[in-house]
Amino acid sequence: MTEFCAPKGVPDYVPPDSAQFVAVRDGLLTAARRAGYGHIELPIFEDTALFARGVGESTDVVSKEMYTFADRGDRSVTLRPEGTAGVVRAVIEHGLDRGALPVKLCYAGPFFRYERPQAGRYRQLQQVGVEAIGVDDPALDAEVIAIADAGFRSLGLDGFRLEITSLGDETCRPQYRELLQEFLFGLDLDDETRRRAALNPLRVLDDKRPEVRAMTAEAPVLLDHLSDVAKQHFDTVLAHLDALRVPYVINPRMVRGLDYYTKTTFEFVHDGLGAQSGIGGGGRYDGLMKQLGGQDLSGIGFGLGVDRTMLALRAEGKSVGESARCDVFGVPLSEQAKLTLAVLAGQLRASGVRVDLAYGDRGLKGAMRAADRSGARVALVTGDRDIEAGTVGVKDLGTGEQVSVSTDSVVDDVISKLGR
């Protein structure tokens, strides 16, 4: 066994799985880029206070799951557990909110949460995300949701469902909070859960323990207590989703794990993943920007799990991504032949052809075995005699047929054989 291994809960992606990883990561954001969302690259770590204030101190993310440490300057920093707070911080810091609105941004990368590792739940999780900041418009909510839906479908995934609800606004949330606390304080909850109920009662509804879920099954539902404005907003979002033909299921008991969500809140679920069924989600966060020191502007966004989407595709028996296999494999039979084939490989690669070469002293048989394993359709075989004659052997690895081709014509001949 090797002396060093990846840390627990931190997956490696190596070929051929890495090809699917890249395809999923990029595919999930294809619809966003077509809708005018520009790329933003965020720091891997931020000031701890950004997440404590933005995500919410009562959340499991902040209280239990963050990787937080003091740097050499004794500053408290945290590996990013999610993307929205960092995006909002960047929008404020760089004055993007002073330009055209909404600010449309997308991102991809690793995020970090200290969780109990299991299939689909990692301590380093790969996500893509989208944020639209500056406009409070239900049509924008629908656009963001439709982009996520299109991202999954572009990969061929179809066994998922969109669950959606509204978490209300500043008008109805305080009244509902009192109603929910009254209900919760009437239950036989443990001390820690009662503390959470006092601090933020919605967090209790997000508790995954079966005994707590059973006790809160009859809790009042926020969707039944929406203000007129929040209800109108939600109804309009649903109308737009209907027009866009994005199917959804209303889940009145949905509670997302982050405190900044308001109004529209949604999650994409795939039952093929077992307990870790969520493959992405998001919502509106109308007070977050002001809370982080910026203008009082609204926003909406989502985060989609690359790791979990890969597992969902596997559950459906589907695969995406172009493998690293090459089209052409070069077999040099001498040192001079290595130079000749290196030049031809460069010319073919410049034309979009994937080329690999045999390195080391494998001999003809060993090099041809490597060519067969490479998955290439064509092998280029040459030695000193071929170089003197100004030719290269071009072998069809499917039929075994080999012909001598003028060195100057090899590139065109190979491209023709590949049907390019």
Curated annotation (Swiss-Prot):
CDD domains: HisRS-like_core (cd00773), HisRS_anticodon (cd00859). It catalyses: tRNA(His) + L-histidine + ATP = L-histidyl-tRNA(His) + AMP + diphosphate + H(+). HAMAP family: His_tRNA_synth (MF_00127). PANTHER family: HISTIDINE--TRNA LIGASE, MITOCHONDRIAL-RELATED, HISTIDYL-TRNA SYNTHETASE. It comes from Mycobacterium ulcerans (strain Agy99). Gene3D superfamilies: Anticodon-binding domain, Bira Bifunctional Protein, Domain 2. It comes from the Bacteria. One of its GO terms (molecular function) is histidine-tRNA ligase activity. Keywords: Aminoacyl-tRNA synthetase, ATP-binding, Cytoplasm, Ligase, Nucleotide-binding, Protein biosynthesis. Its EC number is 6.1.1.21. The keyword ATP-binding applies. Homodimer. It is found in: Cytoplasm. This is Histidine--tRNA ligase.
